[in-house]
Amino acid sequence: TTFWNHLDVGTYVENQTTTSDFIKDEYVDPSKTQLTFPEKKRNLIYIYCESMEMSFADQANGGARDENVIPRLTALAEENEDFSGTDNSQLNGGYSMPSTTWTMGGIFAATAGLPLQTDVGRNTMSTQSTFFPGITALGDILENAGYNQTFSCGSPVSFGGRELYLQEHGNYTFHDYEYAQANGIIPRGYYVWWGFEDARLFEMAKNDITNMASSGQPFNYTLLTVDTHFEDGYLDSSAENKFNDHYSNVFFHSDKQVTEFVDWCKTQPWYDNTTIVISGDHPTMDSDYMENIDPEYQRRVYTCYINSAVSVENNTKRTFTTFDNFPTTLAALGVQIDGDRLGLGTNLFSSKQTLTEQYGLDKEKGELNKKSTFMSELSGNDVSNEEFQEYLNKEGIRSSVVYLQSYDSEAKTATLSVDDIFYTGGNIDYVSVEVTHPDGSRQKVKATHNKSDGRYDAVIDISNGGIEYQTISVDAHIRIDNSDALKTQNIYQYSGNLAVIPCEDNLLQQTLHSAS
């Protein structure tokens, strides 16, 4: 069984009782900022590399590993712009701040310059009728400037609010898993990893961009890779097995795919008037891939700007977050930004300090961890709307945390705990945990209330060899005042037909592996 830690859970409840005006005070509203486009507008290709960190480079190049698993991307950043200053041999990248450490949060940070603080589950924004109607994002700005915009990915785009956000803020066209099936790009019923693999995504992107460029209209083509998603990624059949571990080979192959795609772009007639931005969407959430790195190493996402319309004014190493990608992307297109700030982001090509440089990383993180009434007002979320309640009741959201509490190797039992239960009112009168094994067999166990710390514990029998399974699905059923109010398949809904249990103790993970 595979396990991983949840990010930002431990401090969430505590911080929701403390408010901060940091975002309100520092936010620069793009709708009230003068933006001047060049006479000839540049095209944009934005590549979100799933879970891609600069950490995957070797230590000699500013990474955290003994061997460089992204050598081509390392060279690409060093040859272009990653805001590392005069020392091009050391990679630089953006910090992922609180409420930006998953895909939709990462995209929102890079295009709106804000953390995705919401009053609903992090991946349930698709249940809302609107997505932060009070903001102006990158897509809005480019749409108003006459850009044709497409977002492509190898999974269903609707998950996590991506479709809602990009439709509302930019009127994007979507080329996703459903589009690929409907248009014969993949066969009906074809399903690999999260939908279809990156090899097919990049081939689709080449055709899409060729067609968009032929219209003469400036374009923004944004794509999100998926092969490198945790847990352990998807290794294409054509990939080289250079390293001893699977995930390193996945990143090494993605490194090859992305840079080959960039090389293809450079041969196209539209390239001279096109800027390419490559960024990790967030640090990897894989359970064990980064466990042996130096604990003092500060992980950052991979960042690279290629063929920018402008050069840096202050050629020193910058300290920045993914918020700064918002104005920096526009600046790379040759857009002049009055004040060089948008959202919480700063134009890194300018000499203006980022908020991280101004306040320090810890101070900024601390403020962003607190509840912001300003963000609640901007979000436009309604946790009482009928669609959201129906989603809670029938489909499930990450409305609680389920994790492995303990494992008894002699009794062949595991204790699963349900904690941090989200509900809108009433009293909890029943909690159970249902485990579905890959063979379809199920166990449903009533959880007992541990009053000392508020969690609910359920002891499940795994003597049938369940620990040998690669993954098992876990549902927590929570009844509020005798009505079935919540059902949560703890891990993200789009994790295919399986989910995995997060574990907060690597020792337990090792125990299970050794017992299987």
What is each stretch, according to the model?
Residues 105-118, 293-335:
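Substrate-binding rim/cap in mid-to-C-terminal beta-strand-loop elements of soluble/periplasmic
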Residues 461-473:
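Surface-exposed, short loops/turns at beta-strand junctions within beta-sandwich domains
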Residues 140, 157-166, 309-434, 468, ...:
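Membrane-interface soluble catalytic domains
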Residues 253-292, 330, 336:
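Metal-dependent active-site segment of extracytoplasmic phospho-/sulfohydrolases and closely related
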Residues 473-479:
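Extracellular recognition modules
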Residues 450-463:
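Aromatic sugar-binding surface patches on proteins
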Residues 1-42, 46, 53-219, 226-241, ...:
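Active-site-proximal alpha/beta segments of enzymes that process anionic O-linked groups
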Residues 441-453:
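Solvent-exposed serine/threonine-rich low-complexity stretches and specific carbohydrate-binding patches
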